[in-house]
Curated annotation (Swiss-Prot):
Alphabetized UniProt keyword annotations: Cell wall biogenesis/degradation, Disulfide bond, Glycoprotein, Glycosidase, Hydrolase, Repeat, Secreted, Signal
Location of this chain's protein in the cell: Secreted
UniProt cross-references to Pfam families, sorted A to Z: Glyco_hydro_28 (PF00295)
Catalytic activity annotation: [(1->4)-alpha-D-galacturonosyl](n) + H2O = alpha-D-galacturonate + [(1->4)-alpha-D-galacturonosyl](n-1)
Protein name: Exopolygalacturonase X-1
Superkingdom in the source lineage: Eukaryota
Sugar-modified residues: 113, 129, 199, 253, 265, 292, 297, 329, 354, 364, 423, 430
Amino acid sequence: MKLSHLLTSAVSVLSLGLTVEGHFSRSRNDAVGPKRPFKPLPYSHPRKKVCHVRSHGDGRDDSAFILSALKSCNNGGKVVFAEEKEYTIGTALDLTFLKHVDLEILGRIQFTNDTDYWQANSFKHTFQNATTFFQLGGEDVNVYGGGTLDGNGQIWYDLYAEDPLILRPILFGVIGLHGGTIGPLKLRYSPQWYQLVANSSDVLFDGIDISGYSKSENEAKNTDGWDTYRSKNIVIQNSVINNGDDCVSFKPNSTEILVQNLYCNGSHGISVGSLGQYIGEVDIVKNVLVYNISMYNASDMARIKVWPGVASAMSEDLQGGGGLGSVSNITYEDMYIENVDWAIEITQCYGQKNMTLCNEYPSNLTISDVYISNMYGTTSSARDPNIGTIVCSSPDVCSNIYVENIDVVSPSGTNDFICTNVNESLLQVNCTSG
């Protein structure tokens, strides 16, 4: 059986939602597969106490009930959100004090649509103006149950269309968590990114079901599935993502990241970056393995995006360029694509439309030891006759980029690549320009 058939079969199970049922296994390492984490994940000890979260059930803020239950069952307990109940959160919750506690979410949690409150009180992070409804952190924390977190995103999609400088909260903020499991869970209608994983380590995401599109003419933008930032030894697996931006994005200083067994639809691919955005900052992404991915109706599959060495403006609320750093030991292996604009995109001119200026100011960030292999499927007509682009801003900042066994064609049957400032002898593709 061809790899594409294997991937499609695996994805059909995911798309039915079967992976979001079940319960948490305390042996995190046994749950990871088929590829193993870069380092063993820590063991989670049994819980000895149970706390049930109360709910008003009428849309009033349940944050006080949630906080009370978490404090009562912290250090060795389990907090249960009942299946038949709906919970409302209207207060920014700092949950970084958690230790040795489980959150079993069986019901539905919805965040209020008070945009003025959330812009003023959500948790602010310096990178790319990120904000979160809440921040969950601490040590040995597990969140599971198959229930739903709803970000009430529609009001934010419409508001962002009017004002691109508003601060839209991220639905699920994992901030400073060391040892934990997230999933199975359903995440719906995030105002911005669905999950930010920052300053964290040894965390497994397993069985996450992401979906939520705009119901108006205003698109749901920047709805990344995951963004890892200043984090290490993170595993993301067995999940279904229907969104409108990166399926997974490895932001600055993400190391030892394993991503496997994902179905991504409507996304911008699985991306390293963007990196090099801030002058004076050193961005490092290394030791990343992406394995067994099905990508549909997307702009990219395998993507590395680096800002040039000169100030650039991607949009009014996203500007940068001139930062330092490196990308190294990145592997993409076994991928199936349908209707994807670029099978592979590597650029060091992210955000800069003036290519002459970009070439005059090459990126300060190097890319080395990249391995992309075993990709099957078809691209969209958007870039036909090209199916990929590997463009470095200077031959001095890219080395050891290997591409092999790419069985992908455009709608017209071509398989051309744009190749610039890269060692073409390491690329088993049809480079037609450079």
